[in-house]
């Protein structure tokens, strides 16, 4: 094995696999290091991909040539569109995964990339050559060299598992933590803090009484994640729903002192939007019950994931609380639930490229940046891997803007605002979510991906064909003019109770709220275009055209100062009128642009105006 690479990625989870794939797609020599090759792409917690905000990220990763969407399409055993009754901007795809199929799909996709090499080993230290990053040192002493290193350590960095009053070092149950690297980062004065997350016990599905439970089937046909997938070929399964009850809550309340969290064994903050069952019972004491989704873990296993009861209670209490729920009276538990604490680095120490400000060449992605979720990790991994490869080629970093992608929103939030709890993506975090939809992720990002070298010929050809189909259908509908008094106008009046008063095109009708694409074509007696994705995109574009145009105007106005560079040597004390607090915040984070400065907590609009004036005056003085 060679020991010199352009990019080394540490960690084989969802961030690491995307980082390695992105870097290698650019053709640079890339090494993916993981402590166990058999766990590459492993789903450590829930067997699912997507959801509100998260599905948008998966589509964006796919639009940029990533692997997550392709892998879940090859492994998904139930697909659903969430918020299907709401507007397209907040609709999101979610899929249950067969864990084994997903892991195999990820491994296969990675092994198909020529410039990527996999290796099993635990990183114990960063190789420093003076004050420059030179690679990594494995715990075996093996030295691997690269000027660019991407850390995607997940929950392994100083990880410690908790169950009741018992705890032990682990990256997840059954896998050792990365303690030597965690200690090294602390010694190097990186800003390290602790977060926690958790997972529920697993149940033997043969011990569940499904006959008394509500079934939750997937959509038919299943909605694929990848823009490259035309059909889901994996057999589909239903999930089931049960609920906690008064007895469940009594068991939890009685044993709360034994919980690792409430017993004082864990001080770290967990994810607000994925609380443990103990948290739910305490924080929402007025609720009589909570939903629990029983999710199959695969086609060839009886193991079931009870989504909604993450816990750090002792195992005996876990058995009792599970068996208190309808349909689970005789449940057999296969694995205990637990909480896990781990180290993360303050993401405000990163550039928007996800490169460290403290140590050039070091990139971070995933839970090491304080985020939670496979999808958030994958999106960061792709960006970090891309920019590590671009740095290796001495090219400028690339990061999408907040108006271009949820990835841009997330990274901007992380590097400007930081966090005090695990960060999860929601559509509500985006100012311009009307144009950040799942359906147009390819339109927004695939041209960027092509220019950056992430998108191959096959994907580019498919994207171009789809856009040609959208334009052809737009032209067809725009060219179909309907006259008042015609037979078609009569059918339209019969449907809407409103006769036409002037000539209209079919495209104008599609823009109206009382028409959808299918019913319009039925009235006009037209066959739909052959590309279903193209039909959907055209319809949504028509419906949102006015709103998107207004948002585009907002973006254009903001862009006048958003991208204005702030000199790296800016003396904030010289900016007249800034408060001491604002001055200190700006000096600590040293934002690269006015836009980034405007989103730092505590930096007021008035302060932004003063800063903008100062930067412009400084530029004029230097020019003169």
UniProtKB/Swiss-Prot annotation:
Please give the start and end residues of each transmembrane region: none
Q: Where, in this chain's numbering, is FAD bound?
A: 11-16, 123, 178, 367
Q: Which residues bind NAD(+)?
A: 270-284
According to its UniProt entry, one GO biological process term is: tRNA wobble uridine modification
Which InterPro entries does its entry note? FAD/NAD-bd_sf, GIDA_C_N, MnmG, MnmG-rel, MnmG-rel_CS, MnmG_C, MnmG_C_subdom, MnmG_C_subdom_sf
Stored Gene3D superfamilies: FAD/NAD(P)-binding domain, GidA associated domain, C-terminal subdomain, tRNA uridine 5-carboxymethylaminomethyl modification enzyme MnmG/GidA
Q: What is this protein called?
A: tRNA uridine 5-carboxymethylaminomethyl modification enzyme MnmG
Query: What organism does this protein naturally occur in?
Result: Acidithiobacillus ferrooxidans (strain ATCC 23270 / DSM 14882 / CIP 104768 / NCIMB 8455)
């Amino acid at each position: 094995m060679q020991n010199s690479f352009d990019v080394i990625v540490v960690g084989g989870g969802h961030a690491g696999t995307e980082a390695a794939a992105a870097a290698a797609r650019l053709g640079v020599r890339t090494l993916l290091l993981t402590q166990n090759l058999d766990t590459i792409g492993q789903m450590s917690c829930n067997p699912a991909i997507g959801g509100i905000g998260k599905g948008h990220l998966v589509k964006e990763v796919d639009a940029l040539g990533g692997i997550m969407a392709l892998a879940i399409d090859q492994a998904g055993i139930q697909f659903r569109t969430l918020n299907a009754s709401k507007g397209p901007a907040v609709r999101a795809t979610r899929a249950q995964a067969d864990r084994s199929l997903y892991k195999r799909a990820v491994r296969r996709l990675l092994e198909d990339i020529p410039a990527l090499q996999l290796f099993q080993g635990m990183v114990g230290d960063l190789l420093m050559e003076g004050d420059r990053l030179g690679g990594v040192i494995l715990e075996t002493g093996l030295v691997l060299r690269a000027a660019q290193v991407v850390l995607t350590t997940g929950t392994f960095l100083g990880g410690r598992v908790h169950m009741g009053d018992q705890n032990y070092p682990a990256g997840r149950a059954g896998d050792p933590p990365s303690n030597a690297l965690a200690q090294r980062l602390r010694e190097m004065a990186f800003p390290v803090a602790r977060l926690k997350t958790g997972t529920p016990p697993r149940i033997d599905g043969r011990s569940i009484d499904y006959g008394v439970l509500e079934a939750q089937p997937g959509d038919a046909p299943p909605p694929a994640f990848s823009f490259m997938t035309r059909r889901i070929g994996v057999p589909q399964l239903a999930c089931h729903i049960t609920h906690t009850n008064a007895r469940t809550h009594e068991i939890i309340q009685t044993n709360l002192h034994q919980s690792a969290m409430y017993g004082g064994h864990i001080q770290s903050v967990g994810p607000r939007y994925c609380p443990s069952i103990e948290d739910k019972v305490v924080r929402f004491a007025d609720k009589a019950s909570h939903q629990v989704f029983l999710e199959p873990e695969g086609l060839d296993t009886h193991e079931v994931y009870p989504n909604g009861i993450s816990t750090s209670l002792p195992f005996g209490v876990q058995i009792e609380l599970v068996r208190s729920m309808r349909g689970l009276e005789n449940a057999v538990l296969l694995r205990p639930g637990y909480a896990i604490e781990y180290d993360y680095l303050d993401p405000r120490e990163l550039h928007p490229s996800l490169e460290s400000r403290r140590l050039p060449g070091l990139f971070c992605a995933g839970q090491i940046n304080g985020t939670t979720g496979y999808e958030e990790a994958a999106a960061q991994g792709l960006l970090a891997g891309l920019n590590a490869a671009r740095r290796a080629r001495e090219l400028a970093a690339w990061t999408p803007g907040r108006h271009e992608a949820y990835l841009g929103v997330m990274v901007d939030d992380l590097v400007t605002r930081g966090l005090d709890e695990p960060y999860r993506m929601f559509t509500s975090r985006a100012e311009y979510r009307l144009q950040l939809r799942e359906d147009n992720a390819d339109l927004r990002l695939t041209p960027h991906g092509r220019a950056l070298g992430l998108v191959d010929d096959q994907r580019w050809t498919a994207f171009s064909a789809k856009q040609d189909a959208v334009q052809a259908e737009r032209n067809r509908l725009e060219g179909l003019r309907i006259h008042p008094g015609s037979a078609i106008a009569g059918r339209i009046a019969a449907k809407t109770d409103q006769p036409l008063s002037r000539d209209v095109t079919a495209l104008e009708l599609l823009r109206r709220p009382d028409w959808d694409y299918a019913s319009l074509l039925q009235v006009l007696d037209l066959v739909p275009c052959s590309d279903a994705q193209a039909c959907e995109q055209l319809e949504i574009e028509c419906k949102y055209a006015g709103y998107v145009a207004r948002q585009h105007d907002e973006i254009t106005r903001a862009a006048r100062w958003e991208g204005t560079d702030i000199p790296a040597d800016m003396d904030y004390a010289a900016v007249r009128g800034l408060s001491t607090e604002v001055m200190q915040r700006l000096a600590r984070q040293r934002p690269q642009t006015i836009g980034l400065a405007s989103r730092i907590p505590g930096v007021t609009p008035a302060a932004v105006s003063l800063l903008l004036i100062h930067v412009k005056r400084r530029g004029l003085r230097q020019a003169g």
